[in-house]
């Protein structure tokens, strides 16, 4: 018999199949274990906040290199999320009703990632802040073909004016407008807040910007930025969540079923 002629007494196809099964089982185990780097261990509310890991167990910490050169370890010890809600029934898994002001409760459509980094997102090229107002970047400007949004009145879903657009915040990486900066006026209070572009419609002929998410007076509670010229990722979470929560909680009528 020639050297290496194993096919005459070994079923190579069957061995290949078995090898594939072993490899695939290992792959499933690896992927399922890596999937537990975030969100685990689970908290079982039925047995006194017991931690549930299941099989396979949660892997050890692993470092992930970020674009800014920092390293993030996961899994890592983090404080538990603050749940501003109470179950509407006694059985496990019952829906939660918001506590206090539902617009700021972080529940339902107003939920936000509580552990998001409280630093501005950065561009990949110069590592500068990604989202900034137009007044800080002279190289960017609104195209003359677009509506002149500066100076437009901002109206809530009740049709009452909440303020006036004084600037636009752009994404320097994507070259799009992310927010409009609104100078508030009574009944919306005072100061400036950001209005996300995906929660508004523009009426150029009427010189109006309208949102159907919140009332004019509710602009007063929109989360504000710590810095007048940058917005952190955590602040973006809270701002978007506030307007998103208005889709269900802005009025009492929105919280009830249609039928």
Predicted segments with their positions:
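Peripheral interaction segments used for macromolecular assembly
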Residues: 1-259
């Amino acid at each position: 018999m020639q050297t290496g002629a194993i096919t005459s007494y070994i079923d190579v196809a069957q061995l290949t199949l078995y090898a594939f099964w072993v490899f695939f089982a290992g792959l499933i185990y690896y992927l399922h274990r890596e999937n537990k780097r975030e969100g685990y261990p689970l908290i079982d509310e039925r047995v006194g906040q017991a931690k549930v890991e299941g099989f396979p167990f949660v892997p050890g910490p692993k470092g992930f290199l970020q674009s800014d050169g920092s390293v993030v370890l996961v899994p890592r010890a983090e404080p538990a999320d603050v749940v501003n809600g109470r179950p509407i029934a006694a059985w496990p898994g019952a829906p939660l009703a918001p506590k206090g002001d539902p617009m700021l409760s972080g529940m339902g459509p107003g939920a936000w990632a509580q552990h998001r980094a409280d630093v501005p997102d950065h561009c990949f090229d110069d590592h500068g802040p990604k989202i900034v107002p137009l007044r800080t970047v002279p190289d960017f400007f609104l195209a003359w073909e677009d509506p002149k949004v500066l100076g437009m009145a901002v109206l809530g879903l009740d049709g009452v004016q909440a303020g006036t657009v004084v600037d636009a915040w752009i994404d320097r990486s994507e070259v799009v407008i992310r927010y409009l900066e609104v100078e508030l006026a009574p009944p919306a209070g005072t100061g400036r807040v950001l209005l996300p572009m995906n929660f508004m419609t523009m009426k150029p002929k009427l010189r109006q910007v309208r949102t159907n998410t919140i009332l004019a007076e509710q602009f007063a509670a929109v989360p504000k930025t710590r810095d007048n010229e940058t917005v952190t990722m955590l602040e973006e979470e809270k701002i978007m969540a506030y307007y998103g929560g208005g889709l269900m909680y802005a009025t009492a009528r929105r919280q009830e079923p249609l039928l």
